């Protein structure tokens, strides 16, 4: 059964890119709800787009490896809140790669004057997590990583350009919902999202209470004997 195809230039409140052909309705819907979820989670975020591949010998466990990669990446950044929208792609060579749009909560960070340092550290942690997950050397891992966003995109609901920027970003991301030659798209394995768990403050160890002698009611028990 073929997917419904969107030929118009809009989906809900967003303009979408249909220049090179129609978009899959199930894919654009999945992308839309993932995107709106991120915007509702973060009022101010930095957006980093990149693509990661894996050695072909790991193709059969690609999804599991990228799950491991994300949780390892979050382990490196325990104080960050992160959401990621991913799109799986199969290249002509048969290699599998994932396109990621990462949203980093900007609240703990200084203004974008430090954009380079933020992006540099993100790049380092993303690469390190992938190298460890796929057991690939640091020398070879660069061939599997492609970083697309330079500089980072800043989405801030308090800025006048927010409405324009977040609409432009969705327009760019809508290209990921294009139909492949096989219209029977498995939506769940093609587009999805990762969300970092909120850091929970561990319970402080309970201090032992000092035992206090209870005053006994004289009407029910006899008074203690004198020494």
Regions found by a protein language model. Give the residues of each.
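Catalytic "initiation/cleavage/transfer" segments centered on a nucleophilic residue
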Residues: 1-42, 108-227
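Signature for HUH/AEP ssDNA processing cores
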Residues: 32-85
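Residue-level marker of positions within ordered structural domains that often coincide
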Residues: 55, 105, 135
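Alpha-helix initiation and capping sites
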Residues: 60-63, 79-80, 91-94, 120, ...
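"Short basic amphipathic alpha-helical interaction patches in structured regions
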Residues: 64, 99-103, 112-119
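N-terminal low-complexity, charged segments
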Residues: 68-75, 95, 153-158
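Low-complexity, flexible helical/coil segments
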Residues: 81-88, 136-139
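Histidine-centered divalent-metal-coordination microenvironment in nucleic-acid enzymes
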Residues: 84-109
């Amino acid at each position: 059964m073929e997917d419904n195809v969107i030929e118009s230039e809009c989906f809900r409140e967003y303009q979408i890119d249909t220049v090179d052909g129609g978009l899959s309705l199930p894919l654009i819907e999945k992308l839309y709800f993932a995107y709106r979820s991120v915007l509702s989670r973060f009022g101010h975020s930095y957006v980093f787009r990149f693509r990661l591949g894996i050695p072909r010998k790991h193709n059969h466990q690609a999804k599991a490896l990228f799950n491991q990669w994300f949780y390892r990446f979050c382990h490196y950044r325990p104080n960050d809140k992160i959401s990621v929208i991913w799109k799986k792609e199969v290249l002509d060579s048969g290699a599998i790669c994932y396109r990621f749009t990462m949203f980093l909560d900007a609240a703990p960070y200084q203004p974008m004057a430090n954009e380079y340092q933020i992006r540099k550290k993100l790049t380092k942690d993303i690469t390190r997590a992938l190298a460890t997950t796929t057991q690939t050397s640091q020398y070879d891992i660069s061939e599997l990583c492609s970083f697309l966003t330079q500089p980072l995109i800043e989405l801030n609901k308090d800025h006048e350009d927010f409405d324009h920027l977040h609409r432009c970003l969705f327009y760019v991301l809508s290209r990921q919902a294009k139909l492949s030659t096989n219209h029977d798209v498995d939506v769940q394995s093609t587009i999805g999202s990762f969300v970092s768990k909120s850091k929970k403050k561990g319970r402080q160890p309970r201090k032992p209470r000092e035992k206090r002698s209870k005053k006994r009611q004289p009407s029910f028990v006899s008074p203690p004997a004198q020494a």
